[in-house]
Amino acid sequence: MQYERTLSTVWDDLLESLDSETRDLLDVLAFLNPDCISEDLLRGKPDTTSGNLTVNNSFRLTVMLSSLIRRNLLERNITTTCPSLRMHRLLQLTLLLNLDRRQEKRQEAFDNAVRLTRDALPRRDMTSRLPQFDAIWKQHMPQVLSLQAAFEQSNLSIAAGFEFASLLADAGSFLWEHRLNRIAIPLLTLGEKIVVAQLQEGETHSVLASIENFLAVLSAYDSVEDRRLAMQRLKRVVQLREGILRSLPDKTATLEQQIDLGRAWNDLAYIHADTEEFEEADQGTAKALELYKSLGDERSLRFRFAIQYQSIAAVRFGQGRLTEALDLSRRSYELCKSELGPRHLETARMEVEWSYVLIGAGDLHGALDRLMDALAVRSERLERDNPAILNTKYWIGTVYHYLDQLEEAEEYLRQAIEFGADSDLGKPDLARSQYRLALLLYEQRRWKEAVTFEEAALSSISDEEQATIFCDGDGRDKRKDITMEVLDRRVFLQNGRSTGPFRGERTGKV
């Protein structure tokens, strides 16, 4: 209490000198990221900050901001590329503490902050990915995270509805595309909680289906056990999507609503492919493709066909139908590149997944070219410890290992594990990379170091699985192969596999 009183004393005189409109604006800003509030965000749609402030009265907004800057309640960022403001964190805390004592004002300010942010951010359309919106999402993502924190940390509950949940769902989608899973999952979990609280028993809503879908896919990276839960969640998503379409009058479903159902079928099918249930995977991917063909073609729905071809390619790869898998992977990459351009993250993902099939076909140099291209794109767009970059480096190191270029292989494999558990790289992926490096070190007779990495990798699997390896493995080399296959199968299929049904026609090292 003494701390709160001290903070209030610092700012009270200045706050009391503000007119009501300017104070309302400051309360809204308190829910946003204090380090960088874009002025473009404030000049959004009419009536988003108070009853009198509108985009048509830009001059009035300028006057209010000037007043706040003059009183040192805000300051301009001079280092940012676009006009933005900064608020002292102690002032932000004071404003939020004051709002916690004024429930009606707090709710109004929060709703307006949500509306400002929602209006500034383009809605994520799963029909395609529009690359021109990426910069906008990246610029304003801190505001979404600030709203999430304010909502969760408020002393009193804040009401939130579908608009905020939809914003969280879209943010989760963007973060997943950038493989920022640790940030995305709490956002989506909060969105799910908000939507469920709004729905009556038996009710469905598209926002809930979207959130469930993203949570299922995100959780699939963590462990085999989580992928089993993801399969159950995706079955619910299919039911939700089918229920939404059934509830609509005939021929009134939008293109996106129908595509959302196809996505749900496809994502569930992909999890079946991950667990090597290829018959179910084949049925689900075919069902989604048939739906897309009824809605458009490769020209009108290029992105969705690209995604679908890549999913079917993974199934064909696992079925041993390599010629089909290679053709589908190539078409997937080309469609994605023509839709989004060669430097988009989704294009890079299609290129990496194409490389998995090339490895299975024994075209190691072709795979290496694809992986190097994708690494260049990902390194340009993502941080060094991003799991997409680390996974690409694992595969580059693995291809070099297959080519007996051990020095290059070691370099990339060490880079793949250098951040360890501190990155978003899933535990199964880290263990696989550690064991691949151990195999390389064993080849070089660097026993002590090899054992260290081998033990680290084996610590990620259960005693029962380790016992199975030693029972089935007749001889040291056989045990190494079985261990690599066990660790490889624990990795989510989207991150690639090179053993079991996904070994393909390649011969030589496991």
Q: Where are the regions that the model predicts?
A:
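Extended alpha-helical scaffolding segments used for macromolecular assembly and cargo binding
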Residues: 20-21, 28, 111-190, 194
